[in-house]
Each structure stands twice: as C-alpha cells, then as structure tokens.
Amino acid sequence: MSEQLPKGYSPRLYNQDLGPLPQKWNWYNIFAFWMSDVHSVGGYVFAASLFALGLASWQVLIALLAGICIVQLIANLVAKPSQQAAVPYPVICRMAFGVFGANIPAVIRGLIAVAWYGIQTYLASSALIIVVLRFFPQMAAYAEPHFAGLSYLGWFGFLSLWSLQALVFWTGMESIRRFIDWAGPVVYAVMFVLAGWIVWKAGWANISFTLSEKSLSGWEAFGQVIVATALVVSYFSGPTLNFGDFSRYCRTMKDVRRGNFWGLPVNFLAFSVVTVVIVSGTLPVFGEMLHDPIATVSRIDNDMAVLLGAFAFVTATIGINIVANFVSPAFDFANVAPSKISWRAGGMIAAVASVFITPWNLFNNPLMIHYTLDILAAFIGPLFGIMLVDYYLIKNQKIDVDALFDDSPSGRYYFDGGVNWTAVKALVPATLVGVAITFIPVLQPMANFAWFTGCFLGGAFFLVLARREQVRAPATLVTG
C-alpha cells in the first residue's frame, strides 16, 4: 500500500482508513445505524424473550426503557472521542493503551466480531433454507450434513449470504451508509404489515403482552425488572463498543445525540411492542408460539408474502452483520499493521476467518460457544470502563490527534515501548472477575451483571493506577 503520509505520522500506525476523515453523516444516518442493529432476527427473538420473564407488560416496558436509556447514555459517551478526532475505536484506544498496546483491545474486539459474524450468517442462512424448502421441498435430500458438518443446501445458503455481505462491504463505507439508510425502514414496513395480518387473523382479544405462563409479583418481580434492564444493556454492549467507528463520520455531537435518541429508546420500544404483538398472535393463528420471524413468515399462505418477508429479514441480518460484525473488525485488523492491511483487507480477513471457524459447529456445541464467547465477552465491560475513564477523567476530553499516529519514544501516547501497562494492569484483574462471575457456579446469580461489574472495576482500577503512577495527561490539545 503506497500513500502519502502526513508529516510526523508513522506508517506503522497510519493509513487513510484509520486517519481523520471528512465528517458528513447526519442524525438520520445514526438513526438508521441503530435500526439496522435492532431490526434483526436476533433482536426480534431477544425482544420477545423479555416479555416471557413472568413480568406484567408495564414492568417489561419499564425495564426496556431503563435499559435502553442506559445504552443511549453509554453510546453518547463512547461516541464523543471518535467524533471529536474523526478516527475509529482502535485509534482512540491508543490514548489509554498506547500506540501499540491498543492492538490488545482491537484484537479482542475483532475476535468477538468474527465469531458473531459467522454465527449470524449461519443463523440467517438456516432461516433462508426454511423458505427455500417451502418452495422446493424436493431439495430436502440436500439438507443432510455432508461436508465439515454442513449440508450442501446449508453451504449454498451460508456462502450466498456470506457473498452478499462481502459485496456490500467491499463497495465502501458510503455504500454501507446508503444500505443501512433504507434497510431498517424496509424491515419496519414488513413488521407492521405482518403485525396487522396477525391481528386480523387472531383477533385483538387474543393478543397478549405477556408471553409467559408464570406471573411474578413483589420483590421477585422487582428483581426480574433489574435483570431485564441489565440484559438490555448487555445485549447492546457489542455495537455500543463499536459505535465510535460510526460516530467518527458525524458532523456534530448534536447529530449523534439526536440519532441515538430516535434510534435507541424510540425505535427499540416501538420494535419490541410490534414484536410481541406478532409473537403473541402466532399461537392462535398457527397453533404454536413462533419466536423466529422467518419461520412465522414461511407459514403464511401467500407465496409473494413469504418472499417479501424473507427478503426483508435477510436484508436485516445483512445490515446488522455489517454494522456490528464486519466494519469494526476491519478497523481492528487494519490497526495491527496499517501499512500492510487496508480497511477492506481487514474486513475480508474477518470474513474468511468466519468460515474457517465453522460457526455451525460452534453454534451447535453450546458448551464450546459458552466458553469461547463468554471469556472474550468478559473483556468488553473493562474495555468500556478503561476507555471512558481515560478520556473523561484522565485526559479531560482532550486529544492530541497527531500523537495518535506518532511512534517515536517522545510521543505523547508512546508510554513504555508503545504500551501503557497501567491500562493492561487494570484490564487483567477486571476481566478475571468477569470470567469468574460467568463460570463459577456460586457467582452465577451475578452473571447478568457481568458487564456492569467489568465496566466499573476496569474503570476504577485504571483510575487508581493512573493517579498513582501519574500517567501524564495532555495539556494543550484538540477539544470538542
């Protein structure tokens, strides 16, 4: 890769994808980002699951509102440094972890995204196969596992979706912006039509906003509301950590905050209500409760409706996979060797890796996925805490943008050999606590709060160590 370096920038730290870029996005682009993230098969199943906790519908809505408002606050906090400097998350991490130490959080985040990218692609392809078999039942002979644990039909579905996602990604960030701008609204249109059809077939009297047979009350209900709130925050922890990769393109923080307001509390509550109407109505209409939207669509007695519904939800999956699991690892892997790995190359590394991990085998082995992803996820909370404490409390919201690309020993973010060991020292124990909460049986009741615990401990450890070791803070820098 040959490109002209800005003065003082190191080729080991800079390429055009990682450096500051023109900021053209407005609030609607951020709103569309969150629509693409929420409007997915996973989002549909998650929203429905909250109404099956045994809580009254108003209690679920309180939990949804509390959780999503916390997510909105975190998203605003995470967005600011990247919007201020116009650089992605792994570059912002250089402030806290050092210009080379930032590869630690970048690689961790990249590995999580690769695993989820493969799993999401596999789940969407499985749903697509349901629709294919609806129209071509004779192809059932090709649905038996054959190569590497996947059937011929499974390979066809997986590689088809894999290729579509890679094509959208390869066309560049501007094309991705245009894609997510219409993908979210398309899914909404299908959801509203599907909800209307379900209500028409079932009758409004048969629609219930409680999807569980059990009913909680008193302190038991209060505790479950707190758990539901924590689940909402945990569900959005991945895309929220990635959010700086998108807020960097925004013109102002006002655009970011406005987009977050419409995309998170307003959009998520509306999506959740429509979801529970559809799921509740499947019981009287089909005789069983269906939590998968594509399975619901495939039962409709109209071929055109099935095709349009399947198209909408496959589009939704492509949208969430690109914004949550494709763009971010592209930046993460490019950050490791900017002079050799472009953003596109980083994305394709993630895409190819997602095939080699055979996500269908990973997903079909709950123990393996539990150990692999939960251990990696234990890092997410502490990474939030360290980054936010560093930017807001240690650096006082000041960034030396040029120093983010300076690998000289005198560089502001060079620290000790390019690594700020204070951040590493804070990350390790906070992560170990998260792993302990996840895997030690006696601590299992705290598992739903692992993100909060990790975030608090990571930030607290870093603040104490940074103050003690007197990590130097920037003086006269770019402020926003």
Locate each region found by the language model.
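Membrane-interface "cap" regions at the ends of multi-pass membrane proteins
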Residues: M1-S57, Q72, M191-K201, L216-T229, ...
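Membrane-interface loop-to-helix entry segments
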Residues: I108, I119, S125, F156-I198, ...
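Hydrophobic, membrane-embedded alpha-helices of multi-pass small-molecule transporters
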Residues: W27-Y44, G157-L164, A195-A202, E213-V276, ...
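Selective recognition of specific alpha-helical transmembrane segments in multi-pass small-molecule
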Residues: G42, A66-I74, I108-Q120, P185-W200, ...
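C-terminal membrane-solvent junction of multi-pass transporters and transport-like membrane proteins
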Residues: D17, L21, L383-V464, R468, ...
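Hydrophobic alpha-helical segments and their helix-loop junctions in multi-pass secondary transporters
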Residues: T121, S125-R134, V186-E213, Y235-F236, ...
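Juxtamembrane transmembrane-helix boundary signature
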Residues: A63-F97, R109-I112, W116-Y122, I278-T282, ...
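Transmembrane alpha-helical segments of multi-pass small-molecule transport proteins
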Residues: L133-W170, P185-L194, V225-F243, V266, ...
